[in-house]
Amino acid sequence: MASNFQDDEREQAMRMLFDLYKDESEGRSGVDAYLDLDGMTIPFELKTTSRGSVTTVRDFGPDHIEKWRDRHWLIGFFMQGREYYKYGSPAMMAPWIAEKGKYIEPDFSLAQLAPPKLNLQDMYNILGEKERYTYEDARYIQKRQYSKATYLARQDLDAGYSPQRMLEIVRDRTAYLIKRGSTLNNPHIPLSYFKNWAEITENHALILRQMVKAYLENE
């Protein structure tokens, strides 16, 4: 927990140092920072490290690949008594993101291919054969993955579910479990990945804008 507070403090310091801002309406899960440049709003991922490698996210999956496709990165290094920063354009981060995406791709393909192959007999083997399944039956399968409103909305019988609808719920659960097991737990970006990136040690806001502008002009 203390580490999280320290990261938050460093990220806030980075926003001030580089003249960036956060859209507070997006909440904690929103974009880390934005940069306004020549009428454009540039989204940034902010990271800090004191150990060399850079941590990313708890459950890395296809949604992060899509989210980071056009994201710019700003990384603060606090190591061996030095403090410096490095900027990474979307193109500079693309190889690492693509490598991780390739690693999880077959697992997420399974999450799409496997659930439709489950049939009514498979569902009967889990819940028994019934003409109508209850809210409790559905919750036994999907647990907290559905809200109560979703459970009720999915009922296609009076206060219950038909066998076909319950099969759909079992398939949903199967897809969720495969996807959950397919995400990467906080993949680290090694220090060597940033070896040839330029350090920013002064005139932080100005230099960052120059680097972003140069990237956009050559994109």
Which residues does each PLM region occupy?
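Nucleic-acid endonuclease domains
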Residues: M1-I42, T48-E219
